[in-house]
From Swiss-Prot:
This is Large ribosomal subunit protein uL24. Belongs to the universal ribosomal protein uL24 family. The gene is rplX. Part of the 50S ribosomal subunit. One of its GO terms (molecular function) is structural constituent of ribosome. InterPro entries: KOW, Rib_uL2_dom2, Ribosomal_uL24, Ribosomal_uL24_CS, Ribosomal_uL24_KOW, Translation_prot_SH3-like_sf. One of two assembly initiator proteins, it binds directly to the 5'-end of the 23S rRNA, where it nucleates assembly of the 50S subunit. One of the proteins that surrounds the polypeptide exit tunnel on the outside of the subunit. Pfam families: KOW, ribosomal_L24.
């Protein structure tokens, strides 16, 4: 499945425990169909305390499935599905289905 969400996009979580949260995509894992969203699905690992990490806690954002997020239309600020179209110069650009406007430049 082609990932229509790219790194740097703003997305909203549409299902699960984190439903309704918005964040920026940090990583896209296309083989696993997952994305890492900043501030969403935060996990904590316990490690031995050290001088660099005195409390021994390591927090990170775990990946969530790509079907659980929806791109936020940069023009309207609302969640939207994504389509593609070709420009006159033959360049493929992403299009917000809700507003019909280009997402990529």
């Amino acid at each position: 499945m082609a990932a229509k969400i790219k790194r740097g996009d703003t997305v909203v979580v549409i299902s699960g425990r984190e439903k309704g949260k918005r964040g920026e995509v940090e990583r896209v894992l296309p083989r696993e169909n997952r994305v890492v969203v900043k501030g969403v699905n935060t996990r904590t690992r316990h490690a031995r305390p050290s001088q660099q990490n005195p409390d021994g806690l390591y927090r990170f954002d775990a990946p969530i499935h790509i079907s659980n997020v929806m791109l936020v239309d940069p023009n309207t600020g609302e969640p939207t599905r994504v389509g593609y179209r070709f420009t006159e110069s033959g360049q493929k650009v992403r299009v917000a289905k809700r507003s019909g406007k280009d997402i990529d430049g």
